[in-house]
């Protein structure tokens, strides 16, 4: 069983679909090309391009790799970028972000578990970058956008 907060439950939900997406000879090259393109966009600090490569209206571009999963991959791929860092966006973060006043996040009631628009994801990354800059100035110490994302993840809706 996975430890709490590591992004997967004891059942490893979705892993079979993720493995199948890259094991299937018919879809492998297409899926690898999509993943490579997204990782390249993340590495140069372009969260919108990275996200839009892996999302389609109402579904993921690669079966089993939805936004809650692939934004984690993009986060690590964007390490060290001089551009805007890709940040993790999942239902916990979205719920706490909504509770903090960012009400433009698409949702159904208290359900934030479906895909977000590319413009929403890009705005989210820019918002947390701006908040980090403001916090850095106030505290006179470096605050990073991913620290704010982590605080949102651990927030009251968790």
Language-model-detected regions and their locations in the chain:
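A near-ubiquitous, low-amplitude feature marking generic local secondary-structure context
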Residues: 53-56, 76, 111
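Helix-hairpin-helix/helix-loop-helix acidic hairpins
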Residues: 2-62
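Generic hydrophobic, helix-prone segments enriched in Leu/Val/Ile
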Residues: 1-4, 32-40, 85, 100, ...
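Amphipathic alpha-helical interaction surfaces
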Residues: 6-13, 76-79, 99
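C-terminal accessory module of base-excision DNA glycosylases/AP lyases that mediates lesion recognition
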Residues: 71, 78-158
């Amino acid at each position: 069983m996975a430890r709490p907060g590591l992004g997967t439950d004891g059942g490893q939900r979705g892993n079979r679909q993720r493995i199948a997406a890259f094991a299937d000879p018919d879809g492998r090259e297409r899926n690898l090309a999509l993943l490579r393109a997204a990782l390249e966009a993340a590495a140069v600090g372009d969260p919108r391009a990275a996200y839009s490569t892996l999302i389609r209206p109402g579904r993921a571009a690669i079966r089993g790799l939805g936004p809650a999963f692939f934004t984690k991959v993009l986060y690590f791929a964007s390490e060290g970028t001089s551009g805007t860092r890709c940040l993790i966006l999942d239902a916990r973060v979205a719920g706490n972000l909504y509770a903090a006043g960012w009400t433009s996040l698409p949702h159904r009631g208290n359900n934030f578990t479906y895909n977000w628009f590319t413009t929403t994801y890009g705005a989210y990354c820019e918002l947390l970058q701006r908040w980090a800059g403001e916090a850095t100035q106030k505290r006179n110490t470096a605050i990073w956008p991913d620290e704010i994302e982590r605080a949102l993840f651990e927030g009251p809706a968790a």
